[in-house]
UniProtKB/Swiss-Prot annotation:
It comes from the Bacteria. Mg(2+) binds at S233, T254. One of its GO terms (molecular function) is metal ion binding. Signal peptide: none annotated. The gene is mnmE. It is an enzyme of class 3 (hydrolase). Binds 1 potassium ion per subunit. It holds the Pfam family TrmE_N. InterPro entries: G_TrmE (IPR031168), GTP-bd (IPR006073), GTP-bd_TrmE_N (IPR018948), GTPase_MnmE (IPR004520), MnmE_dom2 (IPR027368), MnmE_helical (IPR025867), P-loop_NTPase (IPR027417), Small_GTP-bd (IPR005225). Its cofactor is K(+). (6S)-5-formyl-5,6,7,8-tetrahydrofolate binds at R24, E82, K122, K459. This is tRNA modification GTPase MnmE. Belongs to the TRAFAC class TrmE-Era-EngA-EngB-Septin-like GTPase superfamily. TrmE GTPase family. It is found in: Cytoplasm.
Length: 459
């Protein structure tokens, strides 16, 4: 159902010169553009036509392909007209200026075509967000997972979970109103406990899928840590094939956080070089060390670098202290660096310690093996297999699923304590409402404005 009274227009191809430039018009006056700009009062539906594009005086501005999609069978659910001409910005601007001279047509806001598609019921909010994720994907895996969400896979997960809550709540409320005709009182506890545990398991599985999708979308954070002068910055440069980080023989050279993106087998990894961890009286270096710990807390994978040409035992003590100080369980790999030096002495026992990898940042030996180690560690920990079943998800989705899980775990405790069936039914309703925020069944205008404002012009 069309909920808008005005008509919008925008260029949908990128700015600058290109071989093709596309203009999209959506709304009640879309066909008015056909009459005024194309001099046509009839267009075949969803059929490409080669026509001239005219200004209001009848002069030809350009020639190209025209596509007509009458609503509701269009992307936005409204009448949609697309003009595909030459991609010269001058021509595009002339056409848009001509179209805007028709009363009732205005320029589209960023993301407004997708917003109209959502508000007209053509896509849900999770699918709308996946459009932006697909456009902005920085790796093959992220693009594939975004397409899965655009096709509705993540929405299916959420809607099926909502159905689980609905069925459970229906049983519970029937028990409240018609206790003599529903579940036998002796079996009520067993039924409720079984359903609670089953749904909790479903929430956890979907949340893990969402976390995986969020990581694919944003990139896997890999923090390079260790003592000063162990070769952390050299390792970042070697892994990224850049000279991004400054490398010197002086301990404490790196004092700020340095980021570099790399793609391994279609997956985005964000390498993060940090200040060497040590006790120092230098206030500037201490700021860098504090920032290093902030990144370590958020890392999906940590590369702890050990200088294989120096005393390894002391460095392993530092490593053990490092492990004890971590607040969460992270995937950690020890990287024995400087294998090209004659002083390098690492025995087989040390090599096997915590998936130890031997490298030389200077010569490149072992660097590709380390890159593949990062990928397969990610693949193993998240059980990724060519993105089958993996969806694009955002932090807000994970936050909502976490709130639902926390609420339902609390409901489980309350049920065991007081067996209040009305309270349980109310908790189920709350969880349903929270999940509705993912697909947009229950949402606020402020949230919609925030989401669609991130889209590019033309989407």
């Amino acid at each position: 159902m069309n909920v808008f009274n005005d008509t919008i227009v925008s260029r949908v191809t990128s700015e600058g010169k290109s071989s093709v430039g596309i203009i999209r018009i959506s709304g009640k006056l879309a066909f008015e553009v056909s009459i005024k700009v194309l001099n046509r009062d009839y267009l075949p539906i969803r059929t490409a036509c080669y026509l001239s594009f005219l200004d209001l005086s009848g002069k030809i501005i350009d020639q190209g392909i025209v596509l007509w999609f009458p609503g509701p069978s269009s992307f936005t659910g409204e009448d949609v007209l697309e003009l595909q001409g030459h991609g010269n910005p001058i021509i595009i601007d002339l056409l848009i200026t001509t179209i805007l001279s028709i009363p009732g047509i205005r320029l589209a806001n960023p993301g407004e075509f997708s917003e109209r598609a959502f508000l007209n019921g053509k896509i849900d909010l999770a699918q709308a967000e996946s459009i932006s994720d697909l456009i902005n994907a920085t790796s093959e895996q992220a693009a594939r997972s975004a397409m899965q969400s655009l096709q509705g896979l993540f929405s299916i997960y959420i809607n099926n979970l909502i159905k689980d809550f609905t069925k459970f709540r229906a049983k519970i409320e029937a028990q409240i109103n018609f206790s003599d005709h529903e579940i036998n009182a002796d079996n009520l506890d067993v039924f409720i406990e079984h359903e609670i545990n089953r749904i909790i398991s479903r929430i956890k599985k979907i949340r893990n899928t969402a976390i995986q999708g969020s990581v694919l979308r944003e990139g896997i954070k890999v923090v390079i840590s260790g003592a000063p002068n162990s070769g952390k910055s050299s390792l970042l440069n070697a892994l990224s094939l850049t000279n991004r980080a400054i490398v010197t023989n002086f301990p404490g050279t790196t004092r700020d956080v340095i980021y570099e993106n790399i793609i391994i087998n279609g997956v985005l990894f964000i390498l993060i070089d940090t200040a060497g961890l040590r006790i120092t009286n230098n206030p500037i270096e201490n700021i860098g060390i504090e920032r290093a710990w902030n990144e370590i807390k958020l890392a999906e994978h940590i590369l702890f670098v050990i200088d294989g040409s120096r005393s390894v035992q002391n460095q392993l003590k530092n490593y053990n202290n490092f492990i004890k100080s971590l607040s969460k369980t992270s995937c950690i790999t020890i990287v024995f660096n400087k294998s090209d030096l004659s002083k390098f002495k690492i025995n087989s026992d040390l090599r096997n310690l915590n998936n130890g990898v031997l490298v030389s940042s200077k010569t490149g030996v072992g660097i590709e093996a380390l890159r593949q180690h990062l990928y397969f560690s990610f693949k193993s920990s998240f059980e990724v297999n060519n993105s089958e079943g993996v969806v694009s998800a955002r932090r807000r989705h994970i936050n909502i699923l976490s709130m639902v899980l926390e609420k339902f775990l609390s409901s489980k405790k309350d049920w065991k304590k007081i067996n209040n069936i009305e309270l349980l039914a109310d908790d189920l309703r709350t969880c349903q409402d929270l999940l509705g925020g993912i697909t947009g069944k229950i949402t606020s205008d402020e949230l919609l404005s925030e989401i669609f404002s991130e889209f590019c012009i033309g989407k």
